[in-house]
Amino acid sequence: MYNTLKTITLVHGVSGKEHRVANTLKEMIAPYCDASHIDAMGNLIAVKKGTSANPKKVLLCGHMDEIGFIVNFVEDNGFVRVAPIGGINWVACAFGEVVSDKGVHGVLVPNSGTKASDFAPDLFYIDIGADNKKNAERKVKIGDTFVLKSNLTKLNANRVVGRPLDDRAGCGIVLEIAKRIAKEPVADDVYYVFSVQEEVGCRGSKTAAFAIGADVSLTFDVTGTGDTAGSKPMAVKLGGGAAIKIKDMSVICDSEVVDKLTRIAKEKNIKSQHEILAYGGTDTSSIQMTGAGCRAGAISIPSRYIHSGVEMIDMNDYKACIDLAVEFIKE
């Protein structure tokens, strides 16, 4: 599991430029599905056909895109001004090493003298080591994208840290589910959706959900925890198991799906916890409301330091998410 997760975290894929991630995952999931394609939006959609004469459609979703920065101006002194892609935690990202989709390295820096309390997008630039505009433009152009440079690392036997676990962890879970049920008879059609542009408005999942017309869905994404110093009160903690989402700021999950996941976790002795997130949202909401709608649920991966280069998860929680989803599909 870890090696697969590490492989997909190494691929550059900000919102709108997920094609490398999609191609990597398409190759990885090929042995475990009946068909796959990349749609017009850029979503990767794979399917395992069910054995039932009248199968229902089950949609499993993780988003491929990550937060990052897009070049919008090159200054005369060679500094590269950028705009954010997605919700950037500027304090966490300041003075971090970044790398572009073309392999150009640099450092994300705030204007000299800027206080952390005043951090804002227009106060940041990337220093790529160029001493003037001409030299900088040999390496970058308007529209190039940068991401935080941080490889996945094991802290101990269970906990890993790096980027972009939001949401390559969700993609990894969907892939591991496909592996687990590949040779098992499953009554329903299972659609594996690796969506695009979640970080900028849950866009890709809307078109994928419309095309599929699912009866039920499970979304896999990271969620915050309440177990760090000074964190807001929250029941979710790292190492507490798969987080069964009840609601967040964008969705109220289907009560039957929540109850079923809760029951299965108890019956199968899968470590779990319940999630009520007071901020943010995921593809769950867009899938739930697309077309005629569907019974939407989510299994979240507890994570610390989201939208930074040091996102942290527990691999036992990761495995619990996979185990719970597999048992849900079998029923």
Model-derived segments and spans:
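N-terminal hydrophobic/helix-forming segments and targeting peptides
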Residues: 1-331
